[in-house]
Amino acid sequence: MTGLFVTLEGPEGAGKSTNRDYLAERLRERGIEVQLTREPGGTPLAERIRELLLAPGDEPMAADTELLLMFAARAQHIAGVIRPALARGAVVLCDRFTDATYAYQGGGRGLPEVRIAALESFVQGDLRPDLTLVFDLPVEIGLARAAARGRLDRFEQEDRRFFEAVRQTYLQRAAQAPERYQVLDAGLPLTEVQAGLDRLLPNLLERLNG
């Protein structure tokens, strides 16, 4: 049995983790095995790479270094968590995946899309998400939410231009492949966002059973 690979994407403060946990609860109520995970991270080694990526430091990180670290963590994550869970027939709910790399390292950092695509093919092979939920909201709201959480990580310290580019890249990718993406308005009250997730459940279950 093959499981279902669902990724949750969006800029800072979009509520991905909260809504990932909500969706997991709804699926588990139906007796479905759910594997919760995140990127960068998901395994002990990948989490150590995450620390390198997120921690502010004295030495600026080159954009290509950042990109390669992202895919190094992803390779470990795919081998250690994602592929085994899918082979068990689980629904994998992943907070960020390769769309985030296109958005942050491509849109935000300005790295060529072809470079990201080459690494995507090398690291992932034929693995792609079955469904991607993009939690969209205005940049100023997302940054205010991130600031309210406390100390900002290395990405959260970027300027508004960076995050506008991130947001637009997500929306462009969603528009190019509407069969895979669902865009949700993360600026709405949480109860309304989660009502939108409830409306998506039948489609998700159909994909799992199909």
UniProtKB/Swiss-Prot annotation:
Annotated source species: Pseudomonas aeruginosa (strain UCBPP-PA14)
UniProt-listed InterPro entries: P-loop_NTPase, Thymidylate_kin-like_dom, Thymidylate_kinase
Keyword ATP-binding set for record: yes
Protein name: Thymidylate kinase
Catalysed reactions listed for this entry: dTMP + ATP = dTDP + ADP
Keywords: ATP-binding, Kinase, Nucleotide biosynthesis, Nucleotide-binding, Transferase
Family (UniProt): Belongs to the thymidylate kinase family.
Record GO cellular component, one term: cytosol
Gene: tmk
